[in-house]
């Protein structure tokens, strides 16, 4: 096998028929477009979503919902993720340095998912009730 002998399998490539080249070609005269009407003309396509002047469905249906601006700067961290952070004190800066939250985050909440075995001090983060109990049971403390 050589690169210059490569060819598609017979019948795999269907050659296109030229349109409007006589009645004998099978696609003469109207060229497969039918008679008259907007779609038979050159450039005669309708844009997507156009329904002939009727109010389109994307405008008939109501808008709903919104994106909370606070969710763009808020994040959550689990106890199992905090257990991996080096150091005794865990704050927003240490979480950013460890790569657990993005730099643009302003608020972080600690959730009780997973376990923590060493004593850590949570500084300046919101903590759920279950996470607070787990941290204090491990010998750590929470400073708001």
UniProtKB/Swiss-Prot annotation:
Q: From which source organism is this entry?
A: Pseudoalteromonas atlantica (strain T6c / ATCC BAA-1087)
Name the record gives this protein = Large ribosomal subunit protein uL15
Q: Name the NCBIfam families for this protein.
A: rplO_bact
Gene Ontology molecular function: rRNA binding; structural constituent of ribosome
Q: Which family does it belong to?
A: Belongs to the universal ribosomal protein uL15 family.
Q: Sorted alphabetically, which SUPFAM superfamilies does this protein's record hold?
A: Ribosomal proteins L15p and L18e
What GO biological process terms are annotated to this protein in UniProt? translation
Q: Which Pfam families match?
A: Ribosomal_L27A
Q: Does the keyword RNA-binding apply?
A: yes
Q: Which domain of life is it from?
A: Bacteria
> What are the record's GO terms for cellular component?
cytosolic large ribosomal subunit
Q: Where is this region: Disordered?
A: 1-59
Q: Ranges of Gly residues compositional bias?
A: 21-31
Instruction: Name residues in a coiled coil.
Output: none
HAMAP family xrefs: Ribosomal_uL15
Q: How does it assemble?
A: Part of the 50S ribosomal subunit.
Q: Does the keyword Lyase apply?
A: no
**Which taxonomic lineage does the organism of this UniProt entry have?**
Bacteria, Pseudomonadati, Pseudomonadota, Gammaproteobacteria, Alteromonadales
Per the entry, what this protein does is: Binds to the 23S rRNA.
Q: Which UniProt keywords apply?
A: Ribonucleoprotein, Ribosomal protein, RNA-binding, rRNA-binding
